[in-house]
Amino acid sequence: MLQAFQHRRWSLVLLWILIVAAIIAAPAVLPVFRLNLLGRFLSLAIVALGIDLIWGFTGLLSLGQGIFFALGGYAMAMYLQLNSSADLPNGIPEFFSLYGVDRLPGFWEPFHSPVFTLIAIWLIPAVLAAVLGNLVFRNRIKGVYFSILTQAALLVFFNFFNGQQKLINGTNGLKTDVTQLFGQMVGSPEMQRGFFWLTAVVVILALSLIHISEPTRRY
């Protein structure tokens, strides 16, 4: 049994070495399009880690994990919209004119700041998760009821966001195909590699935090 455990341990070590080697080699061997695609897969891996944490260690299947990912995405999208709208006559995103809105809604204003945006990307989902988690676990909701509740929460948020045409463009979503970000050309190979490395580092940090956190160390 001990030998089997050691074999499994070394197999995992070898697997991690191969994964890290592939990540390091990817920017050198992949074209920009493929690298961008791999970066998107890695960002979705962060969501998968969240599902793995709560399902694998507590047995609770969350069907609403996309809520928190989407909130962070909307925060970044709002900054990108404002960044790309700076040269417009009224200085607000184009979609507002479709609904007769001629002034930027107040809650959009802080997203002119990249610092505020980066904080909001982490803080808004965390606060919502804390509130929902407190309500769920205080009432000891578990099993299939937990899954149904999280799926219902996802549908509530989905319908709410889709209905906010005048505020966040509803079903059409927010345009994020900007040409510049933080003064750099988004489409340049250097920026694409930077995005990839940033995403890879966040995935590794998230995985490391899961493994060193107190609840998971018991396993």
Could you tell me what each predicted segment is?
Residues M1-R218:
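Transmembrane alpha-helices and adjacent helix-loop boundaries
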